Regions:
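Conserved ATP/PPi-binding loop(s) of AMP-dependent carboxylate-activating enzymes
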Residues: 1-36, 70-72, 168
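AMP-binding/adenylate-forming catalytic core of the ANL superfamily
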Residues: 2, 7, 34-37, 42-136, ...
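Short coil/turn motifs at secondary-structure junctions
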Residues: 12, 109-111, 146
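Short clusters of hydrophobic/aromatic residues that line enzyme substrate/ligand-binding pockets
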Residues: 21, 27, 31, 63, ...
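Active-site and channel-lining beta-strand-loop segments
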Residues: 43, 144-150
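General small-molecule cofactor/ligand-binding pocket signal
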Residues: 91, 141-144
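Acidic/polar alpha-helix N-cap and adjacent early helical turns
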Residues: 163-192
């Protein structure tokens, strides 16, 4: 109740308190409701034959292509099985017909002759098609010298997405990356 000016009353700050309560409820709902008494990180994982756990990526990294929800982690896992591939990252790019198309940034173990790039691209899409299905084949593949990563090793997909969308003016601060120089190299390759 508002008492107006010059009246003694009790103070209650609803907006601050309500935000705290909502944040706590949202936090519990997001991280503790998926599995009883367990914290859900949002990461996918599997256990290999040696008992080791491998984090496969965010389960919410999903790109909708022609009405199909495609997770980036399984596609990247298929790509990374290629003998010449060191690592990969997939982002979605708007497409007139499909809604989104798949854009792959791929780092090779050894710098191959650029004449073999087309063969490697075909091999990669065959692997994806065989393991996941033809809908998951990449529309664009770019071989890059490295992927932008945080100091903890997380691939900065946000930056890769912006480069793929030709939005390089809004990359944000890249100086804190483990390898900030790779961003310029990727931009030079992609937007040449």
């Amino acid at each position: 109740m508002d008492l107006g000016l010059s009246h003694l009353g009790q103070q209650a700050i609803w907006s601050y308190l309500s935000k705290l309560i909502l944040v706590e409820l949202s936090y519990k709902e997001t991280y503790f409701s998926a599995f009883k008494n367990k914290y859900f990180t949002g990461d996918g994982a599997y256990r290999d034959e040696n008992g080791f756990y491998r984090i496969t990526g965010r389960v919410d990294d999903v790109i909708i292509v022609s009405g199909h929800n495609l997770g980036t982690a399984p596609i990247e896992d298929a790509i990374n099985e290629h003998d010449l591939v060191a690592e990969s990252a997939i982002v979605g790019v708007p497409h007139e017909i499909k809604g989104n198309s798949l854009f792959g940034y791929i780092t090779l173990k050894d710098e191959s002759n650029s004449e073999t790039y087309n063969d490697i691209k075909k091999d990669i899409n065959q692997l994806i098609s065989k393991q996941i299905g033809p809908i998951a084949k990449l529309d664009r593949i770019e071989f890059v010298p490295g992927l932008p990563k945080t100091r903890s090793g997380k691939i900065m997909r946000r930056i890769l997405r912006k480069i793929a969308h030709d939005d390089i003016k809004n990359l944000g601060d890249v100086s804190t990356l483990l390898n900030p120089e790779v961003v310029k190299k990727i931009i030079d390759l992609i937007l040449k």
